[in-house]
Amino acid sequence: MKYLALILALIIGTPSIAVADELTKTNFYYDIQWGHLIIGHISVSVERKNSSIKLKVKSRSEGAISLLYNYKSDLVASSYKEDQIWRPNLYMVNSSVRNKQYYSKVFWNKKNKKLNYKIDPLLDLEKVYDVPKTTLKNVIDPITAIIRVIEKINKDKPCDTKLRIFDGRRRYNLSTKELEKQYLINDRPRSFKGDTIVCGIKVTPMGGNRIESKWKPENDKFSDIKVFFGTAAKDLYLPVRMKLNRWFGTITFRILSNF
């Protein structure tokens, strides 16, 4: 479950954001499943005005998992389009993990593109690697990163890309690669059914990751994290499902709607 913050950013960052001006305000809902158990829910509110996008996201753990790993998070992010490129403006997260509070805020100045950030508490450098200031040049937030990816897909281009990401606590490089096209069946009530484009994701940590961890990023494959993009609304490709395979099992995210 330590991957949850990254997964949330990857999947909730993209609904309806891509290229359609007519999608001015939309709500989306996702279930989170681990094995056969529903362990959480995500609600997403997306607002678009002219060339800017704002997201408000609430995620909560649910069921038996809450007894062992109580999690909740409120995320606000905004991006804007300038010179045909989506750029970051704000990425802010208030979260609680096992009743411990975490806050992070990253702000990019629109004029000089420089960033400022604040986190509380500070990184515990006995448990995680430091984030060198020298690595923060030309970074974007996870939401803006996936907006760029989904825009490529909606322009009939492969999702292949490499991006430099910073979310306030973690600095990593994100690589995406188109794997295949796959027809999804609606294996759960209200889940998506139809053709999808499958993109694989690899994450290379550059700071903020745990010093002692079972995660070995050098052994990761693009097939370990899959995002399924389907035409769920207005002929736009949106993330309709996501699968994360790790040593502790498989976590699946499913968009919920009346398809």
Residue ranges of predicted features:
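Sec/Tat signal peptide C-region and signal peptidase I cleavage site
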Residues: 15-20
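A charged, solvent-exposed segment within the mature domains of Sec-exported extracytoplasmic proteins
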Residues: 112-174
